[in-house]
Amino acid sequence: GSMKKVMNLKNLLFCALFALTMSLNAVNVQAETLDYLGQTIDGSILTDKLESSGEYLSVARSTYLHQGTVRITNNGGGYVGIFGGTECNVSCNTVKLNVYLERSNGNGNFYSYQKWENVEYNTNSVYMSKQVKVEKGYYYRLRGYHSCTKNGVIENGGSVTDGIYIG
C-alpha cells in the first residue's frame, strides 16, 4: 500500500502546482488589461476610476433637447451602476433614452455588451437607473442616445463615458 501513498502525494502536488499556475495566468491577464490604462479607444480614456460620466449639452439654437447624461459606476464585486437621462426644454410627444453598455479588453474596440431602450410620451424627461453584474477583467463604458420629438421635429444627441476597469 506504500506505493499508492506516493502516487497520491504526487497527484496532490501536481494539483497544487496546476492550481497555482492557473491563478498566476489569471493575474497575468489582469495585468495585461491594466497595461492599457490611460490609453484612448474610440474617444474613451481607459481608467481605473470608480465612476465616469458623459454629457450631451444642446447647442444654443436647440428648441427641444436640453441635455443628455450617462454615468457608470464601479459598485464592487463585478457590479456596475448605470444611470442615464434625457431632458427636454418643454414637454414633448416622445422622449427617448437608449443606453448602451460596451466593453473592451483594452487592446481592441469597445463592443456592445447590453442595451436598454427607454421611451416616455408627452413629458419632458426620461431616466433610467440600474445595477448589472458584468464579467470582470474588462473596461466598461456607457454610450447614450438622447432624443426629444415634438410636432414631427426630432432633436437628438449622443453622450459617452470613459472606460472604467472592472476587476
Which stretches of residues belong to each language-model region?
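Exposed aromatic-hydrophobic patches
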Residues: 125-133
